[in-house]
Amino acid sequence: MDDTVKNTTDPVFLHDTFLAWCDKQPVPVIEGFGMDLSKIKAEPWDLYGMNGAICLLKGRDDFNSIFCFELPPGSKSRDIHHLYEEIVYVIDGYGSTQIETPDGDKHSFEWGRNSLFSVPLNAKYQHFNGSGTEPARLATVHNFPFLINMFRNEDFIFNTDRDFSERLGPNGYFQGEGQMIEIRPGRHQ
């Protein structure tokens, strides 16, 4: 009798789950050393409820990437939540974002061109275009590639209800209590 344990699944070596996920998305995937995010063609993306494109910078490794989103005039995104960290930069337009914290409180804030913000990890949020005549364009830098390659489970990343309330900070963060940091000439990081 053979007591050898047989592997019933194929090994997953040199497989990039993120790139395979990108291939299944109905939006353009653009790769290059640089790209003008204000001119990229964005197509409808039901997952987010807005138009979008996936932007892959050469040399990015498997840690992060960019999604470019466009909200048509007067539109809004779907309610979204996910386990990846994301920083949002507003390329053009103005609008608002509503965040629902784990305790059910809703906070909203406005944004405009050159705004930069981040939504708390796995909090539900929705973007709104504040213009009835002009689109709003957002670029997000995120660590989704790292997480999807680690867990290999899209459902886990987009449908986990775990709250991270310890990462929310004080309520003042949602009420405009902040400190304006003036731009200083020179190179700073």
Task: Give the location of each predicted region.
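A short, N-terminal "cap"/entry segment at the start of jelly-roll beta-barrel domains
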Residues: M1-F63, F156-Q189
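Conserved short histidine dyad/triad with adjacent acidic residue
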Residues: M50-G52, S65-L83, T101
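Short histidine-centered beta-strand/loop micro-motifs
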Residues: C55-K58, S77-H82, I99, S108-E110, ...
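Short acidic-glycine-tyrosine-enriched beta hairpin
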Residues: R60, T101-N122
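His/acidic/aromatic-lined binding-pocket segments of jelly-roll/cupin-type domains
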Residues: C68-F69, D79-H81, E85-V90, S108-F109, ...
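Histidine-centered metal-chelating micro-motifs
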Residues: S75-R78, S96, S115-F117, L121-H127
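A short hydrophobic beta-strand segment most commonly corresponding to one strand
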Residues: I87-Y89, F117-S118, T133-R152
